[in-house]
Amino acid sequence: MLVTAPALTYAQTPDEEGTDSLARKESPEVQVAFRKMAQKDLLGGVSVVNVEELTKKNYNTYSLDNMQGYIGGWNGNSLWGMDGDHAGYLVLVDGVPREANNVMPSEIAQITFLKGAQAVVLYGSRAAKGAILISTKRGHAGGLRVSLRANTGFNVAKAFPEYLGSAEYMTLYNEALLNDDPSAKPLYSAEQIYNHGSGINPYRYPNINYYSSDYVKKACNRSEATAEISGGGQRARFYSNVSYYRTGDLLNFGEAKDNMIDRFNVRGNVDVDINRFISTHINANATFYNAQNAKGDYWNAAATARPNFPQNASPLIPVDLIDPNATSALELLSTTSNIIDGKYFLSGSQANPTNVFADNYAAGSIKWTSRQFQFDAGLDINLDKVLKGLSFNALFAVDYATSYTTSFDNKYAIFVPTWANYNGKDVIVALSKEGNDEKPGTQNISGSSDKQTIAFSGQFNYRNTFGGVHNVSGMLIANGYQQTISQQYHRISNANLALQLGYNYRQRYYADFDAALVHSAKLAEGHRNALSPSLTLGWRLSEEGFLKDSPVIDDLMFSVSGSILNQDIDLVVGDNEFYLYKSVWTQNDGYAWYDGPAGKYTISTRGENDGLSFIQRKEFSANLRASLWQKLITVDASFFINSMEGYLIDQPTFYPSHLNTGYPDASFMAVQNFNNNRRIGFDFSINANKRFGEVDLSLGVSGTYYDTKITKRDEIYDNAYRYRQGKPIDGIWGLQSDGLFRNEEEIAASPEQKLGSTVRPGDIKYVDQNGDNVIDDKDEIYLGKGGWYGSPFTLGINLTAKWKDFTFFALGTGGFGGYGIKNSSYYWVDGDDKYSAIVRGRWTEATAETATYPRLSAKSASNNFRTSDYWLYKTDRFDLAKVQITYDLPQSILHNTFIRNLSAYVSGANLLTFSKERKHMEMNVGSAPQTRFYNIGVKAVF
């Protein structure tokens, strides 16, 4: 069952040797910043998912897969809508900054989402936009336990883009030429169009469908095997995980048949009690990852290569189409070793000497390799002999990651045919050769990169109870890490001292003060340290006399928090992060005399500002948690409002203009803290649990809503409607359309559209916002929220039903309130672009009243293809993200065997999308298609 305790989501299913129950632990421990806490003592801004239990009924392949379906505050992209500019939320795996995609769900015990500023303040600057704590599994005292899991399934393509065939494309391209110039001659004759459309000779008159089953499969396999071994005694315990998966590819020709991704991983976690006072743990993980692909970007070619190209020559032509009497052609063909399947040669044209099909067959292959080694060790010392409740913890970690690319880089020849028709049959009478076959047989290495992470933390902890009612806690922490990345001079660093002081009376009244002294090398001396304080107050109303004996309320907790976090992760201007407070002088410009001597002059390109300071996250939040009717319903809801203040500007408009000149390109303006952004919103998680006869049901609903606003922005515009201040941070700005021009008279009577291309009937007409009788960038207005940091409202629904030994699980997620622009090459078609099916709704004189697409143009159509509400669409959607049915073999069958537990399951992921724009949302352009995943798995515990 899925049960959410206050601020806590736990997925509960039958344990491996017991029976299912709606009951849960009274107060499970939750990993938060630098400590574990009983869930009942959490003060808001924290949500957690018990992944170990969830995996028993929901098999996943990614650690953060659809977590928005279980908790509030996480929308799949961000925590509380915080941006990911320069750096987003911090991910810590076992307390060390690591990537979420390098730990598999089978390795994870628990994931904690730290949303509120009060929850992340102890981590310092790098966690200013939230943190996700991933805790891996640990061993437990007891006998040896072995768990084996095997999965196999198929990724099935959801949809492919639809493009016009050769004949239709050629017809419409001729139309585009006439649209641009009514006196233009057609590029393609009626005979050529007929030949390409009839299929009379697809090798001479190509009509290439890149999504044909000749090249693309409907599905590809993914298989995975995992072994988990754990056990130990009172003194030492261990957990190990060995896993391997391999994923195929949808392409099914040439070298691409062998496209694959595979990953092998070994993890070992050991806990040792050295004595009654000292314990330690060691975690190690090694990952080997490979991605092999054929040369050539097939999916990009599928979105850009026209169906009739190369002209007069299909990329692959049968050898037997060569006239037997054309001996010179046959002799020339004998110089190549690239005869595909013994019967096709590589073809093209002088203008197209390469193509993606030939690349896949003859250009070689490329393999990206990644190796990661992660190690961390911790020490825990009980100092009760010094002071009751005192302890010390330390953690040290070293991670290495390296990656490189190996490739076989071959070159190939293509043969350009000369066609003739003998007795009604097309034959090749001559060939010309472009390029040469070159297979050096050497493996090339490129793109080598590496990354090292070193992390350390040490802390004194104090926890004690006085008089049985006064509970006191405290932590004094020194924490820091550095990441060294190849080809980057400056390391990514985070260093801070932190203090936590907590008190509660009878677990009824709570007060918690947290503070961090953060440090940044990005700022000038004297400004590199700042204090980040946070205060949280909590009140458990259910312990008050007026609610203590309530038959409805089991637990009711309310808390409020105020925080100011100082961060340096957004201290960025362009590509520069360091020494932004310093002035910059250059001698790059000058002049030269005709007789040779040259002079350089020294100019300032940036002024100095030693007062440059941290960006601040100022936040107020409130949290309400409740358990009702003996845990029949649990509720966790939060409200938040925060302001990110002091974003940098480098060309302040409030400086006199003479401090910045265009020629020479000089400036005395200094970088300043100025811009502010605000976010306000709420999140919730509601769960209901009920048993109906032999059926246990659990229903969970979670959601996150946030609204953004630019509260301060350095900007100057002539018109009020252009100001970004007061509008959403993720606002989409563009022109307001007013249909399509019907004729030249309407164009002449309308404002002049200075948008880079000649306006003709069938082009998009725009509204002149400022009344200057000109359409340009000054007429752009706010169009809607882009949802860049996740949809404004995110919804999650999960349902679990258990009957006897069957468990049914379903998960749905939704995103609402955002807008997008249809601006891919599928929609914005001009010049020599490939024509998609969308152009069938184009404007013509005959369809002027019903057209859904602007006129076609063989030139640039920048007037039409720019951000405007003509291309705007709502991104509202609801997805059936997962369905799984699990069967657990009854213990009555297994009790006399060496198998403790045996279960089998079938599942489907990414099954359905409900949206007005479903076809658009399920279609990828220029990349591999989206897929549904159908899986079957089995798990055995020994």
Model-predicted segments: where are they?
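Extracytoplasmic gating/loop element in the C-terminal half of outer-membrane beta-barrel translocons
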Residues: 183, 354, 358, 761, ...
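Conserved small-residue
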Residues: 147-203, 296-304, 572-575, 663, ...
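Glycine-rich, aromatic-lined ligand/substrate-binding cores of catalytic
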Residues: 388, 789-821
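Alpha-helix-centered segments that form part of catalytic cores
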Residues: 195-219, 436-437, 443-455, 772, ...
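Extracellular/periplasmic, surface-exposed regions of secreted and cell-surface proteins
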Residues: 269-278, 284-288, 320-324, 328-409, ...
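Short, small/polar-rich motifs associated with maturation and membrane association
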Residues: 1-267, 279-281, 926
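Outer-membrane beta-barrel proteins
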Residues: 96-139, 159-163, 206-226, 245-283, ...
